Amino acid sequence: MSRGLYPGRFQPFHLGHLNVIKWSLERVDELIILVGSSQESHTVTNPFTAGERVEMIRNSLKDVGMDLSRIYIIPMPDILMNNIWAHYVSTYTPKFEVVFARNPLVVRIFKEAGYKVEIPPAFNREKYNSTYIRRLIILNDNWSELVPKPVYKYILEIKGDQRLREIVGTDK
């Protein structure tokens, strides 16, 4: 059985992330989705809690009929030592053989630690980009088509859009 790791902050989880998960599951039997920066929330760059992000991811995967028995969703706090981060991750997760990542630092860290790294396609990175989506939310612009429907519904339900605008002082 093969198992891969897909690390990200998922602030918020969007359709690009969903496409990477689908792509990754074509290559491994099981996938660990690592929800990074789990200690962060209520900031402009990390507005959602780890628990909220886990719910966004799980609800989105259920919505598309994904087999959740093939998926682990694991929150993990940051450490400020990149040289041991890959080892740190391995202490939080089940064993994995391959890492799916596009972030150059993440790619470098896991390669140096001896892991196989596969770089997923960008899947329209200009649109499917959490920074861009957060900006649209702050501006009260349309972002609903950039995230899975369960994510959009959930963010409105928890008033995450209002939270983000209040954090930057632009509650319109």
UniProtKB/Swiss-Prot annotation:
Coiled coil: none annotated. One of its GO terms (cellular component) is cytoplasm. It is found in: Cytoplasm. Pathway: Cofactor biosynthesis; NAD(+) biosynthesis; NAD(+) from nicotinamide D-ribonucleotide: step 1/1. CDD domains: NMNAT_Archaea. InterPro entries: Cyt_trans-like (IPR004821), NMN_Atrans_arc (IPR006418), Rossmann-like_a/b/a_fold (IPR014729). One of its GO terms (molecular function) is ATP binding. It catalyses: beta-nicotinamide D-ribonucleotide + ATP + H(+) = diphosphate + NAD(+). The keyword Signal does not apply. Its EC number is 2.7.7.1. It is an enzyme of class 2 (transferase). GO terms for biological process: NAD biosynthetic process. Keywords: ATP-binding, Cytoplasm, NAD, Nucleotide-binding, Nucleotidyltransferase, Pyridine nucleotide biosynthesis, Transferase. Pfam families: CTP_transf_like (PF01467). Belongs to the archaeal NMN adenylyltransferase family. This is Nicotinamide-nucleotide adenylyltransferase. The lineage of its organism: Archaea, Thermoproteota, Thermoprotei, Sulfolobales, Sulfolobaceae.
